[in-house]
Protein backbone atom coordinates (compact mmCIF):
# COMPACT_ATOMS: atom_id res chain seq x y z
CA UNK A 1 0.00 0.00 0.00
CA UNK A 2 1.20 3.52 -0.77
CA UNK A 3 0.62 6.16 1.88
CA UNK A 4 0.71 9.83 0.94
CA UNK A 5 1.56 12.74 3.23
CA UNK A 6 1.08 16.33 2.03
CA UNK A 7 2.90 19.36 3.43
CA UNK A 8 1.07 22.59 2.60
CA UNK A 9 1.10 26.25 3.65
CA UNK A 10 -1.81 27.36 5.82
CA UNK A 11 -2.71 30.74 7.33
CA UNK A 12 -1.25 29.64 10.67
CA UNK A 13 1.87 27.86 9.37
CA UNK A 14 2.56 24.60 7.54
CA UNK A 15 0.36 21.53 7.91
CA UNK A 16 1.02 17.84 7.42
CA UNK A 17 -1.98 15.91 6.08
CA UNK A 18 -2.78 12.29 5.35
CA UNK A 19 -5.97 11.54 3.42
CA UNK A 20 -7.18 15.09 4.08
CA UNK A 21 -6.79 14.82 7.86
CA UNK A 22 -4.39 17.27 9.51
CA UNK A 23 -1.78 15.39 11.53
CA UNK A 24 -0.03 18.54 12.73
CA UNK A 25 0.61 22.21 12.08
CA UNK A 26 4.11 23.66 12.31
CA UNK A 27 5.63 27.15 12.23
CA UNK A 28 8.16 26.40 9.49
CA UNK A 29 8.19 24.47 6.24
CA UNK A 30 11.33 22.56 7.25
CA UNK A 31 9.82 21.41 10.56
CA UNK A 32 6.65 20.25 8.80
CA UNK A 33 8.70 18.47 6.13
CA UNK A 34 10.79 16.73 8.81
CA UNK A 35 7.65 15.57 10.62
CA UNK A 36 6.11 14.28 7.37
CA UNK A 37 9.32 12.39 6.55
CA UNK A 38 9.27 10.79 10.01
CA UNK A 39 5.64 9.70 9.47
CA UNK A 40 6.63 8.30 6.05
CA UNK A 41 9.65 6.40 7.40
CA UNK A 42 7.53 4.89 10.18
CA UNK A 43 4.92 3.80 7.62
CA UNK A 44 7.60 2.31 5.37
CA UNK A 45 9.02 0.31 8.29
CA UNK A 46 5.71 -1.53 8.50
CA UNK A 47 5.91 -2.76 4.92
CA UNK A 48 4.15 0.10 3.14
CA UNK A 49 5.63 2.60 0.75
CA UNK A 50 5.10 6.27 1.44
CA UNK A 51 5.48 9.55 -0.38
CA UNK A 52 5.85 13.06 1.02
CA UNK A 53 4.66 15.88 -1.23
CA UNK A 54 5.17 19.62 -0.71
CA UNK A 55 2.13 21.32 -2.21
CA UNK A 56 1.95 25.08 -2.87
CA UNK A 57 -0.70 26.88 -4.86
CA UNK A 58 -2.32 23.56 -5.73
CA UNK A 59 0.84 22.30 -7.45
CA UNK A 60 3.34 19.70 -6.27
CA UNK A 61 6.63 21.51 -5.62
CA UNK A 62 8.63 18.57 -4.29
CA UNK A 63 8.11 14.84 -3.81
CA UNK A 64 10.11 12.31 -1.80
CA UNK A 65 9.47 8.55 -1.70
CA UNK A 66 10.14 6.09 1.09
CA UNK A 67 10.00 2.31 0.74
CA UNK A 68 10.28 -0.58 3.14
CA UNK A 69 13.68 -2.20 3.42
CA UNK A 70 12.00 -5.43 4.56
CA UNK A 71 12.00 -8.11 1.88
Write out the residue ranges for each language-model feature.
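Short, mixed-charge low-complexity intrinsically disordered segments
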Residues: 45-70
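A short, exposed loop/beta-hairpin motif centered on an aromatic-Gly-Thr core
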Residues: 19-31
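Short aromatic-glycine-(Arg/Gly/Cys) micro-motifs in beta-strand/loop hairpins
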Residues: 1-22
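Short, solvent-exposed secondary-structure boundary motifs
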Residues: 1-3, 31, 43, 70-71
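Short capping/connector residues at structural and topological boundaries
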Residues: 6, 28-31, 65
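Short acidic, gly/pro-rich beta-turn/loop elements at beta-sheet edges
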Residues: 17, 26, 62-64
